[in-house]
Curated annotation (Swiss-Prot):
GO terms for cellular component: acetyl-CoA carboxylase complex. It comes from the Bacteria. It catalyses: N(6)-carboxybiotinyl-L-lysyl-[protein] + acetyl-CoA = N(6)-biotinyl-L-lysyl-[protein] + malonyl-CoA. This is Acetyl-coenzyme A carboxylase carboxyl transferase subunit beta. Residues 28-290 form the CoA carboxyltransferase N-terminal domain. The lineage of its organism: Bacteria, Bacillati, Bacillota, Bacilli, Bacillales. It comes from Geobacillus sp. (strain WCH70).
Amino acid sequence: MWKDLFTKKKKYASIPSEKVRSEVPEGIMTKCPKCKKIMYTKELVKNLRVCMSCGYHHTMPSRERINSLLDEGSFHEYDADMVSVNPLQFPGYIEKLEEDRRKSNLNEAVITGEGTLNGYPIVIAVMDSAFRMGSMGSVVGEKITRAIEKARELHVPFLIFTASGGARMQEGVLSLMQMAKTSAALKLFSDEGGLIISVMTHPTTGGVSASFASLGDYNFAEPGALIGFAGRRVIQQTVREELPEDFQTAEFLLKHGQLDAVIHRHDLKDTLTTVLDIHQGGGGHGWWQS
């Protein structure tokens, strides 16, 4: 009996091999990809989605950006119901569009409209990478072109925020045509004295970077934004040279004269207001030359 007491094996509770799932609901917390700090999403949104620890600029949804810049209640959206079709009958394209509409609560990769920024009337276009990675298809090109034409009609500045992976491959050459179409609209607008302000956000690449994104009278960018046409690996294999670590970043482009300024998101509204102040002149729409 005494022998059994001392030789009896201890029993241990078994631990499940599966990872214990977090009880924190999805969306409550956000992890910064740069410094790895975990923060409340609500606090991050209040800080314009700029990391409170390292200053990393997280992706900002288009409607949040519009609300952060324009005067309250001043925004009127254009072409909200315009949606893409499948002109080339590309397999699975319609299903992907429907999935993105459901997930992003957007109809397309750009929102356009008019409003006032600290009292200045403007036409604005804001791209959103949550929808098809902000890719430019026929509808994106059409909405941006119509917005430019509206700014031309109203004699007000045109402000665009870009965030895109480039042309939308599912629409083939129809997508590539939007590069020429939007650029031509900007040329007409500029020739008549219209003010164009472009703000490139992460990422601005492909056909978007090679067309309307780079055609502003002022070309600004947010810190750390990836900006370029072809991918880093493609360029490296073509030139057969090691590229700088900061290649295709906003800071690299600024250093080489391709940007006018890299602007922290917290300073963006004040900077845009200053630009409008300068071009406004003595009152009215002083930015319109003709």
